[in-house]
């Protein structure tokens, strides 16, 4: 089985800065693999271990994907190779535009039997790209996948959790016409941490750059990005023990009008 895993690189949200004007500061913020795509990479690795190959596919800017560090991070998590689409002219914040770029890149990547995605991305979490990729490729798409089990002869048992039940589907990856696009949830597995040997091997795996497919103009434009307005929180330290501290607290609350 030939597996393509789509993964997005996003700014590390733990190091974002909120500027005085409430805009988000991205200067110096490192890039990382989207948390939900780590689950997709882990699922791909587990399936490929049973017999098959795995290719990672990522689309984004040169700033996000151009460093060898982030490329090695992706490759250390199981893929045999990495295909990149670098385009600094598009922010890829429109889910349909992103899906068109991914679908074109998947077709350019060659033969495949299964396409895996995360349910959403850590930064935008639209939860739309996977099903849109399936529609553009003319393939069945299943989202919120919580389990994938090989059933022999290229067939996969796919589970997804609905509100009151678990739905079980069969996906046949024997021929390209029966390929599928699966968007996995974070519940499907716990992503493993790459061992040192995996990191060392990652530097020797092939990285190929693909031309950006024609994905049209975005239907969404970002006008501004603002953090929630911060409210000043007042603090009062009440010292003392027992009744003395209680009396001081009551006096403070009365003074503040509570």
Tell what function each PLM region has.
Residues 1-258:
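N-terminal glycine-rich FAD/FM-binding segment characteristic of electron-transfer flavoproteins
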């Amino acid at each position: 089985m030939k597996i393509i895993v789509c993964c997005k690189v996003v700014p590390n949200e733990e190091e974002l800065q909120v500027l005085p004007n409430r805009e988000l500061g991205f200067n110096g913020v490192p890039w990382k693999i989207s948390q939900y795509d780590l689950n997709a990479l882990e699922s791909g690795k587990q399936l490929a271990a049973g017999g098959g190959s795995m290719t990672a596919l990522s689309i984004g800017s040169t700033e996000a994907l151009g460093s060898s560090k982030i490329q090695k991070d992706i490759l250390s998590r199981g893929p045999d190779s990495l295909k990149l689409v670098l385009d600094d002219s598009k922010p890829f914040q429109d889910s349909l535009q992103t899906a068109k770029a991914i679908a074109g890149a998947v077709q350019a990547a060659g033969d495949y039997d299964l396409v895996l995605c995360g349910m959403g991305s850590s930064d935008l979490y639209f939860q739309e790209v996977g099903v849109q990729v399936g529609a553009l490729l003319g393939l069945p798409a299943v989202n919120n996948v919580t389990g994938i089990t090989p059933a022999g002869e290229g067939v996969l048992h796919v589970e997804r959790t609905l509100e009151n039940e678990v739905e079980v589907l069969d996906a046949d990856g024997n021929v390209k016409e029966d390929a599928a696009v699966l968007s996995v949830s974070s519940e499907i597995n716990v992503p493993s941490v790459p061992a040192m040997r995996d990191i060392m091997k990652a530097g020797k795996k092939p990285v190929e750059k693909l031309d950006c497919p024609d994905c049209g103009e975005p239907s969404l434009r970002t006008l501004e990005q603002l953090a929630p307005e911060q409210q000043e929180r007042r603090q009062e330290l009440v010292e003392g023990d027992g009744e003395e501290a209680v009396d001081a607290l009551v006096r403070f609350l009365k003074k503040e009008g509570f």
